[in-house]
Amino acid sequence: MGKDKNPRRVGENEAFAKAKMLRTSPQKLNLVAALIRGKKVEKAIADLTFSKKRISQDVLKCLQSAIANAENNHGLDVDELVVSEAYCGKNLVMKRGRPRARGRFGKIMKPFSELTIKVKQVGETA
C-alpha cells in the first residue's frame, strides 16, 4: 500500500532552495536578500557576483540551487525565472566567552542564519 505522496509546498510554476547554518546574523543576511528580491535571475546572479558583502557568495550558491531545482525537478524555463521571495530567519547562536577585568566573563554571541529563496516562472512581461 504505502504512503501517499506529499503535496507540493509551492505552486506549479515555482521552485525553492534553502541554505541553513549560514555564519552571519539575519540582519546582515537580509541586506543581501533584499538586493535580489523581485529581480530576474540573470540580474540577481550578476548583482551577487559583484557584491562586496562576504555572505553574498553563500546567497549566490543558494540561488543557483533554486534555479537548478526549477530546471531539473519542475521543468521550468530558466530564462523566465524571477526571484519571487528571498527571506531569512534566525538559527542557533553559538555562545563563546572572553575573560574581562576583575574576574568577570564577557559573552560573545556568534549567530547563525538560514535563507530561503523562491523562484517563479513568469511570462515575457517581467
Swiss-Prot record:
Gene Ontology CC terms, in alphabetical order: cytosolic large ribosomal subunit
MF (Gene Ontology): rRNA binding; structural constituent of ribosome
GO process terms (BP): translation
Keywords from the UniProt entry: Ribonucleoprotein, Ribosomal protein, RNA-binding, rRNA-binding
Coiled-coil region list: none
Listed InterPro entries: Ribosomal_uL22, Ribosomal_uL22_bac/chlpt-type, Ribosomal_uL22_bac/org-type, Ribosomal_uL22_sf
SUPFAM superfamilies for this protein: Ribosomal protein L22
Biological role stated in the UniProt entry: This protein binds specifically to 23S rRNA; its binding is stimulated by other ribosomal proteins, e.g. L4, L17, and L20. It is important during the early stages of 50S assembly. It makes multiple contacts with different domains of the 23S rRNA in the assembled 50S subunit and ribosome. The globular domain of the protein is located near the polypeptide exit tunnel on the outside of the subunit, while an extended beta-hairpin is found that lines the wall of the exit tunnel in the center of the 70S ribosome.
Family: Belongs to the universal ribosomal protein uL22 family.
Family annotation (HAMAP family): Ribosomal_uL22_B
PANTHER family referenced in this protein's UniProt entry, alphabetically: CHLOROPLAST 50S RIBOSOMAL PROTEIN L22-RELATED, LARGE RIBOSOMAL SUBUNIT PROTEIN UL22M
Subunit structure: Part of the 50S ribosomal subunit.
Protein name in the entry: Large ribosomal subunit protein uL22
The species this protein was found in: Cereibacter sphaeroides (strain ATCC 17025 / ATH 2.4.3)
